[in-house]
Regions:
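Helix-loop segments that flank and shape redox-cofactor active sites
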Residues: 39
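A beta-strand edge to alpha-helix "cap/lid" segment located at domain peripheries
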Residues: 2-17, 22-32, 42-152
Length: 152
């Protein structure tokens, strides 16, 4: 895996992409965020919407940042990377967002989630070939199963 200008480890390539993602998000520059994706990338957002390709990603996120995400701040929290082959790695990025709003305009509480990225080299460096984003959800509280009734 390589960065745009140098040969580097998958871990470092993912760190650079995560830093660039955070910077682009916080600048609300979705064109720059889109440049981190392969032109034919698959991107599934936290709501399950499947965006196909860089241009669909950019179009959707430009609109989102004009409305709900206009005042949002993204923070990278943790990153793990596993090299799958010389040109492919799997990354998980834990994040937090503050300052975004619901579609009706109500301010949301800060929230966390996990991004899953498939990273690939494209001849110019590492890019996000596929991404799936999800919000952390509270774990369900386990309830004990009642003991089965005994036959008499």
């Amino acid at each position: 895996m390589t960065d745009a200008h140098e040969s580097t480890s998958p871990q470092r390539a993912a760190e650079v992409l995560a830093q660039r993602w955070q910077h682009a998000w916080n600048a609300h520059d979705m064109q720059s965020a889109g440049e981190l994706l392969a032109p034919d990338a698959d991107f599934v957002n936290v709501g399950g919407r499947w965006l196909r390709g860089r241009s669909e990603f950019v179009d959707y996120h430009v609109r989102l940042h004009e409305m709900q995400m206009r005042n949002s701040t993204w923070s990278d929290l943790a990153l793990t990377v596993r090299e799958l082959s010389a040109d492919v790695a799997l990354a998980h990025l834990e994040w937090q967002i503050e300052g975004d709003r619901d579609p009706d305009g109500r301010r949301r509480e800060p929230r966390r989630g996990v991004f899953t990225w498939v990273l690939a080299t494209d001849g110019h460096g590492a890019v996000i070939a596929a991404a799936h984003n999800t919000n952390h959800m509270p774990a369900p509280t386990p309830t004990p199963n009642p003991a089965p009734a005994r036959a008499s």
